[in-house]
Amino acid sequence: MNRRQFLSLAGASASWVFLSGHSPYRQWMVYRETHLVILTSRDDLGADDLGEKFAAIVREALPDSGAAVGRGPRVQRIASLISTGQAMVGVVSRPNALAMYRGEGPFQQYGSIALRILVQNEAYQLVCREDFLPQHGYLLTEALMEHMSMADGAGLDLSVPGRDAADAGEIPPHVGALAFAEGRSLDTKGGQ
């Protein structure tokens, strides 16, 4: 082995040792396990603004949630992260949410995504994965809906879809959000 080959091999080995333990994916996994990441996209400023409001409300009502906004470059990134279980919650326009749910249009490559609605207004929906814990859905919906009744939350005009949403061709509500909307109790202390 000549000097050039040795130095190349040594450099490659050193790079591998230093870089192999610093995958941002692992840091993302830890971050999302300790924070509620509300996804938004830079290509929809309305959803981004609403996501910021939601995160601020949730941080105030549920400080342990560590609620934060995670911005993707396009709404397709939200579909990618939610469909693969790398994220649980996102703010999406109603047409985009329905297209994600059905696996249509720009979301065909992700297939039909099992989404549920936590809260919605006229233009946007706070969507989550179907397997988002019922307790978390209940607490999140409770925080947002109760804030809406305050003076500074009046402009949010939020609602929870009814049980018949799926029959009407819409995305069904999350089980925890529906329990809150119907005034049913849910064990919010159990689970994770």
Give, region by region, the residue ranges found by the protein language model.
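N-terminal export signals
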Residues: 5-25
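Short, well-ordered beta-strand elements
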Residues: 32-44
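A bilobed periplasmic-binding-protein/Venus flytrap-type ligand-binding module shared by bacterial periplasmic
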Residues: 40, 118-136
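Short, polar/charged alpha-helical segment
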Residues: 47-63
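Short helix-initiation/N-cap motifs at beta->coil->alpha
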Residues: 63-80
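A ligand-binding cleft/hinge motif common to bilobed small-molecule-binding domains
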Residues: 87-109
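Short beta-strand->loop
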Residues: 104-120
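An extracytoplasmic/periplasmic, membrane-proximal ligand-sensing/linker region
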Residues: 152-192
